[in-house]
Each structure stands twice: as C-alpha cells, then as structure tokens.
C-alpha cells in the first residue's frame, strides 16, 4: 500500500472518529433533555398527595446525583404504591362528596315546593353522580345548590307570609296571640300544614330536632320516649320540629327564615374547606335568586374595548394558572411523541418504539410517566449504541467492497495475462505452421506430394485460428460479465452514497434550525458568521451585526403563560424574516434574542433598517382577550472594522443592546 493510500485511510479514520464524537455529544444533549423533562414532569405532578410529592422530590434528587440505576430501582416500587394509594383516597373523597351533595338535594326535594322549582332540583340531583367526579365541578355544584336552596327558602317564606304564620321567635318565646289562645296545640296545625310530609333522616345525615312536647289538654305532661330525647339533645341550632300528638317519634321540619348553604349542617364526610381545597377553587359567592346568569362571551373577540377590530392571528392564549397533570398531559404526550419520532431507531428496536408510542398516545397518566420515561431513556441509550454499531457495520461493508474491488482487479490482471499467453501461443503456432509449409515445399519431389503437404499445413493454420478465436470469445464474455457486475456494484455504492449524503444534509438542516420559530439557530449563526467574515477579508466591503431583544419578555411569560410567549416569538420571527433582504441573515440566538447580519450595508443604512424592524414589531396588533397589548424591542448595532473576529464584534453589539436596555428600552444604540 502506497504512502498516499495510508494517508487517505488515516484521514478517513480521523474524520469518522470526529463524526462519532459529534454523535456522542448529540446523544449526551438528548439524555440531558430527557433528564430535564423528568424534572419538569415531577414538578407538574406535585400537589395531589404528600406521599407522591415525597417520591417526586426523591426522583429529582436522584436525577441531580445522576444515580439513575440504583436510585430508580428502589424508588419506582414505592412510587407505584404511593400513586395507587393516592388514587384510592381520591376516589373515596369523590364518593363522599357525591353522597353528601345527594343527601342535601334530597332534603330540599322533601319540601313541598312548586313544580317550576322541583324540576331544576331533580335535574341537579340526577347530575350529581356524573359532575361531582370532576373536582373542577365541585364549586359550580355548590353554587347551584346554594341558588336552588335560596329559591326554595324564598318560596317557603312567601307561603308562610301569606298564611299569616307566626315568626320563628314568636313560636319559640310565645307572643300576645299565644297567651290568649285557649288551646295550646292550636299552633301545631299551621306547622303541619306548612310541612305536612315527615322527613326521614338519611343514615349519614345528622338527626333532625324534635319540637317541644306540647302538654295534652286535660292531663299532666307525659315523659318523652328515649329516642325523642336523644333526637332533641343531638339537634343542631336553627332547626325546629313539631311532633304530631300521638306520634312522638315522627319528626317534622320547620326551616328558619334566612339560612345560607354554609350554615346548613353538612352530612358526614363533606366539608367546604376539604371540598374546595380538592377542587382548587375559592367558594363561589351566593347568587341572588332574581339574577339570571349572563351568557358567556364569545371565545374569539371581534372588537376590543375601544371598538377597534382585532386580528385573531395576534390573539394571545389565556394563561393556565398552576395546571394539574390533566392540563399539561397533552403537551407532555406531544413532546414525548416528537422526541420518539426524532429517534432514528433500527428495525430491531421498532417493536419497543411502537409499544411505547401506544402507551404515550392518548392514555398516559401521571403515575405511568416515570416508567415511560425510563423506557424512553433505554431507547435513547440503545440508539447511541446502535449508532456505534452502524458505524462499525459501515466500515465492515466498506472493507468488504474494497476487497471485492481488489478481487476484480486481480481477475482483470489474470485475464490480461491469459490474453497475452494466448496471443503468444497463437503466434508460435502460426510460425510453426508457416515454417513446416516452407520445409514441405522445399522437400517436395513431385506435384502430388507438394499438394498434400500444403493442404495439411493450411488445415493446421485454420485449426489454430479457430482455437484462438474461441478462446478470445470466451475471454471477452468473461470480462464482459465482470465489468457488468463491477458497474452494478459501483451504481449501488453511488446510490448508497447519495442516500447517506441526503440523510446527513437533512440532519444538518435540523441541527441548524430553531424548532420553535423556524429561524436558523446559534450553530447556523456561527457557520454563517465565519463565511461572511472570510468573504469580507477576501473581497472587502461593509458588514454589520445587530442584536435585538424583546422588552419585558419575562413579564409576558409570567402574566400570560409560556404558550403566549411562544406565540409572540413566532410572530416576531416572521415579521423580522419577511422584512429583511435576501442577502441578509437572521438567527434566533436564544430566548428572546435575535442576531442579524447585514452584508454590503453601510452603518447608516443598517440603522434605518433596524428602526423599521423595531417599528414593525411595535405595530403588531397583539391583543389578549380583546385588550390591545404593546410589545417593543431594543437593539444594538455595530460594524466590522479591520480584521476583527466575529466574537469581538458580537460583544460590542451586545454591549450596545444593554445600553439601550438601561436607557429605558424600546430604542436602538449604535456602537
């Protein structure tokens, strides 16, 4: 092997080693991204149960210590048990809420109410089972129950006023009319008429009170049965019952004149604090009975408060206040599916990937998230190993093809040697035949013997020529077959090389593109900056570099949510890109910062262009729920001087940007 071949193979080996190191760095970055996703997911899963929160805290500690093998093997069983226990407790609390709300609704249905009030109350009782299983519906159910109870009490109060019934205090302490009444039980029929249906208390509800036992006329007072006494002692304040004469154990309800939902005695297992705390909402204020609920506003406003038309493309999505897992589950599933789609898995790992995709797609709950992430980490690690194996397989196939080429070259050389041998043999045969013919002519004594000798020699010449042609045809056919096979191998290698080059180019474009805005990223900026600096050193001319930063972008994320921030970045990136020239270059440097390269542009022309870009961003009609929202940006611009490196010029433009920030933002500084 020559020295050039040795150097060429050495260069190929070094290039492949460098490529392998780049792949290793890429996989390290993906593993770090997966670890960060685990930490964010554990934070999103907190807040529902103390035991689960402790496991999530331990999970983050394990990820920080990078002790995933031993740490996760001990944590996962405890986490699964804590998740199952938490789910059981949540279901028990939900069932207690359903039972308690149902009992309250049944107590109201037991009253003598008009049909127009009983109908929504029955509908409410039928909907409790389904709606109360969602914690966000609990405050709404309590508000509806409060409104229905207020209407029922108002209806009963109106009926009592029409019947001329005495007030509650008059019945408790007696009045002028009761002193002159001869019959002590005269007030009993009015109470019975107001509530003529005995109410049987539910098993989980507190016992209803019993009224004072009226003294029967014509006889001494009789002692109350033990069960009635127990009911009186356990009766809560605010309830007055009247027992019909002769039936001391039958309980009748006389409700107070003014009572709110939170003053009712709640059945066992239901409390406002626990219910609202689980639902994550504050108690809804009571709604007056005569106030109808206003219709909901349209989802997409057409006009803002000033009556101006707004553009739906610039509408920011509403913020999500501390979402639970159910709110962030679609985002987590989409992120995991995108990560899974981005993995170039070999065919041997496709079944595991499809099984993992089925587990993620549409049915992932938060206590299955950790096992899914573990399996995804295994796939990522196996893909890194697979990349190493693919590279080794590629080198092996390359060696085999080189050996095949060497074999074809050896065969071609052997064929060439055979052709030379055949040519020399044919020449020798011709010379022998001609020499024999000459000798026969000289030795012939008569014409007949000469004729026979010449004929014999000519036949020998023809036979030698036929043999030579046959061998030549066989050799040509063999060489043609070898050339055809060699051409097929060369075509196959060309196709493989094109596919490999196309795949590398696709991966390169993905690596140089920001996935959120579609602009070139920092790596693409570094590559383009080197090209522009080299061009300027070679050809001369002007070259400007500008850095733009969105003002108060953190406040946008905090006030309106990260989805709104992402939408702002996409819109601003589109506005900047469509207003730049074809020769200009813009990249997202990171966060809310953008970098612009302006070749062949003077400093004054670049300043005017940056001012137009800032004005275009400020003119974007951003709005949130119909309210206009002003978003501005600050910028710093500078020009290359002499043989400056790109890093020094970028630092100067960055300092100009910070001067604009310190000077009040929404301005351009020239360095």
From Swiss-Prot:
For region Disordered, the annotated ranges are: 204-223, 278-298
Gene3D superfamilies in the cross-refs: 3.30.70.270
Q: Which coenzyme or cofactor does it need? A: Mg(2+)
Can you state which reaction this protein catalyses?
Answer: 2 GTP = 3',3'-c-di-GMP + 2 diphosphate
For molecular function, the Gene Ontology terms on record are: diguanylate cyclase activity; GTP binding; metal ion binding
Q: Which GO terms describe its biological process?
A: cell adhesion involved in single-species biofilm formation; negative regulation of bacterial-type flagellum-dependent cell motility
Protein's pathway: Purine metabolism; 3',5'-cyclic di-GMP biosynthesis
| Active-site residues, record numbering mapped to chain | 592
Q: What is its EC number?
A: 2.7.7.65
Q: What class of enzyme is it?
A: transferase
Localization, UniProt: Cell inner membrane
Q: Which residues does Mg(2+) bind?
A: 549, 592
So what does this one do?
Answer: Catalyzes the synthesis of cyclic-di-GMP (c-di-GMP) via the condensation of 2 GTP molecules. Cyclic-di-GMP is a second messenger which controls cell surface-associated traits in bacteria. Localizes at the cell poles through interaction with FimV where it increases the local pools of c-di-GMP.
According to the UniProt entry, the note on domains is: The GGEEF domain is required for function.
How it assembles, according to the record, is: Homodimer.
Q: Can you name this protein?
A: Diguanylate cyclase DgcP
The species is: Pseudomonas aeruginosa (strain ATCC 15692 / DSM 22644 / CIP 104116 / JCM 14847 / LMG 12228 / 1C / PRS 101 / PAO1)
What gene name is given for the protein in this entry?
dgcP
